Amino acid sequence: MRIAIGAPGNGALLKDALAERLAEDGRVSDVLDLSTPEITYPEVSFQVARAVAEGRVDRGLLICGTGVGTAIA
């Protein structure tokens, strides 16, 4: 399974820990990190959603401070 992961700055620590754990999982063939230090939650939400819609990944995982922003975006 290919997974895109993304987070704005306030979710970076959790995102990094999850990406590391996913990379160790034998069921996951690729973890695509679409984050940058200055990215906002709407931007990263759109990038992860687009990666799923275009078929570049099978699943998307978004992390932010509360989850509300990424859910709305």
Model-derived features with residue positions:
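Glycine-rich phosphate/diphosphate-binding loop of Rossmann-like nucleotide-binding domains
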Residues: 1-24
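Short, conserved beta-strand edge motifs with alternating hydrophobic and charged residues
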Residues: 6, 29-32, 60-64
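A generic "binding-loop/recognition-motif" signal
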Residues: 10, 67-68
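Loop/helix-junction capping segments adjacent to catalytic residues or to phosphate/diphosphate-binding pockets
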Residues: 12-13, 38, 42
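Short helix-capping segments at alpha-helix termini
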Residues: 22-27, 56
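A short beta-strand-loop structural module common to alpha/beta enzyme folds
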Residues: 27-40
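Short, structured active-site "lid" loops
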Residues: 44-66
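Short Gly/Thr/Asp-enriched flexible loops that form oxyanion-binding sites at enzyme active sites
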Residues: 69-73
